[in-house]
């Protein structure tokens, strides 16, 4: 599998090599007008999310789709649909929407999340990123979600339903 390489080009990161992406498109042909990010599919998700700090995970239904936990020596965090926030939540920030990079990402791929973050940062859209074994999820505040998807489309990402 060939590793992706990125170069900085006119304020967004563009791919200069693109091979071996499972379940994704191919690198555009030389001289093609097709965007360089073709093949990176962005899939918006329906739920409205909460980002929470919890005392423990006892009240969390981890069998629900889209439940993400993170535990460190300093805190226990939870990202879940708004309706699934447990009672033992210490703090919460509601009003997040999410999209994921469709397909499975190989661990050798680099710069994918950085490219998305750069496009959104250039438009002053804050993100909360979560990585799983298969792929990356990106959350933005609900008020910024449509603008984020539009910015990514403009940068050549393919938004699918």
Regions found by a protein language model. Give the residues of each.
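Intrinsic-disorder-associated, low-complexity terminal segments enriched in Asp/Asn/His/Tyr and depleted
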Residues: 6-9
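A structural feature that tracks compact, well-ordered secondary-structure segments
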Residues: 104, 108-143
